[in-house]
Amino acid sequence: MTSIEPTHLGKKVIVGMSGGVDSSVSAYLLMKQGYQVEGLFMKNWEEDDTDEYCAAADDLKDAQAVCDKLGIKLHTVNFASEYWDNVFEYFLAEYKAGRTPNPDIMCNKEIKFKAFLEFADEILDADYIAMGHYVRRRDIDGTSQMLRGIDGNKDQSYFLYTLGHEQVARSLFPVGELEKSEVREIAKEMGLITHDKKDSTGICFIGERKFTDFLQTFLPAQPGNIETSEGEVIGTHQGLMYHTLGQRKGLGIGGLKNSNEDPWYVVEKDLVRNVLIVGQGGNHPRLMSNGLIANQLHWVDRKGPADGSNITVKTRYRQQDVPCRVTYDSDDILRVIFDEPVAAVTPGQSAVFYDGEICLGGGIIDALIRD
């Protein structure tokens, strides 16, 4: 493990302590670098059942234990109202409109790097905030760039593309310089109880519940037909909002007569007729796109790539970068043409653009280009 010499004596950092290993090690590394470190635990969702309450209470307990071990203060704050207004209502509206949003991206934009930063500034007098995200920051020519995390498998820049360079400049990402295995090793060496804690998965307000069960409590079911791409009715669905392009599981249409053994995939959602359209094979022509139109553009450096640039794009998390060419239809509408067709590009999701290691920013996928 590389030692880090103290170089930041006196600068105050508020670390978002989630009760997980990444934020735990982030706090330790910043202390080792000489920062004055305090923790802040966010409550972003008002639980309505015992299981969710226990999960949040356990996370707070773990965060407190880590802070006690490190000898730092832990503050708590409730952002449930801000989360509901700025993240959850957007999430529901997008699903109601037949799109597939990413609430984690909106949470980072509105809560972790806005409400959290404002609270850390105004109440806790912070110089910086820090999170356990796997990204890196690089300061160059008076601006702050966001780079992919060293651990390519854990890189979370896709979820942080809505940050501006001012927010990046106020943020520290210690674990972005490490592999996940190194983070767990450090936590174990330091005797932190989170060293072997399982990484959280899924959307925080859903927890371990089934997604469809959760969504049905807020959006009533709207049953309709499932059709093949040739127009044959082969089943029914409970609501288009429960399905996403490229989905394979949970369709309930296996073992049909007169069909080959290739699995069925969702290839389109017909919102006008409330019909789910499916096709066989992961490379079904109606599942493929040659490009996309993105809007609600956000660039970390405010400028964005030049018109006609050849860069790369991710249309979903953990996807390999896709080489592409970008042109502007307007200041807030970007036309993206892939070098090769891409499967299951999904309206409502984010397209995030890169120039090598640099995360440039991105936008919301509004439409697909298929010719």
From Swiss-Prot:
Enzyme class: transferase
Residue segments, region Interaction with target base in tRNA: 102-104
Pfam families noted in UniProt: tRNA_Me_trans (PF03054), tRNA_Me_trans_C (PF20258), tRNA_Me_trans_M (PF20259)
Keywords, ordered alphabetically: ATP-binding, Cytoplasm, Disulfide bond, Nucleotide-binding, RNA-binding, Transferase, tRNA processing, tRNA-binding
Active site, UniProt feature: 107 (nucleophile), 204 (cysteine persulfide intermediate)
Region (Interaction with tRNA): 154-156, 316-317
EC number: 2.8.1.13
GO biological process: tRNA wobble position uridine thiolation
PANTHER family: MITOCHONDRIAL TRNA-SPECIFIC 2-THIOURIDYLASE 1 (PTHR11933:SF5), TRNA 5-METHYLAMINOMETHYL-2-THIOURIDYLATE -METHYLTRANSFERASE (PTHR11933)
Name of the featured protein: tRNA-specific 2-thiouridylase MnmA
Protein source organism: Shewanella halifaxensis (strain HAW-EB4)
